[in-house]
Amino acid sequence: MLNVLCVNWGLKFKPVYTQNLYNMVKRHLTVPHKFICYTNHIKLQKIVKGDNIEIRKLPFAEEYQGYWNKLSLFSPEAKLSGPCLYFDLDVVILDNIDCFATFGNNETFGVMRDFGQPQMYYNSSILRFNNSNAP
């Protein structure tokens, strides 16, 4: 099953951003999936509502500042196994995203190109990776 991931850490995004992302994914992804939000918000579990959603504490987040805390998702302590599709909380999904779920094979790492300079830079707002070899 596909793991759809997000990180809601610190004060930048209110819990409603997690709810909105969950709702967009549910509306535009037909592939079987589980939605997992890594957070430090104690009450997020009570605020965000939906089927097949998990709220987890993000490992090692204190070691990374700002958007770099998403690197914790690659740690064995994140307890992820199988295909993963990550979205930043400010991503807007307007149409079907099944192509992201089926992109590549089990060894493929996917990252989007930067809109401003697509020939030079990448943007980690959307990531596709596989943790099949995770413990």
Name the predicted role of every residue range.
Residues 134-135:
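Short, conserved charged micro-motifs
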Residues 16-19, 121-125:
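Surface-exposed flexible segments
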Residues 43, 50-62, 68-121, 128-129:
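GT-A fold catalytic core of metal-dependent nucleotide-sugar glycosyltransferases
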Residues 2, 33, 107, 123-124:
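Short, surface-exposed beta-edge/turn micro-motifs
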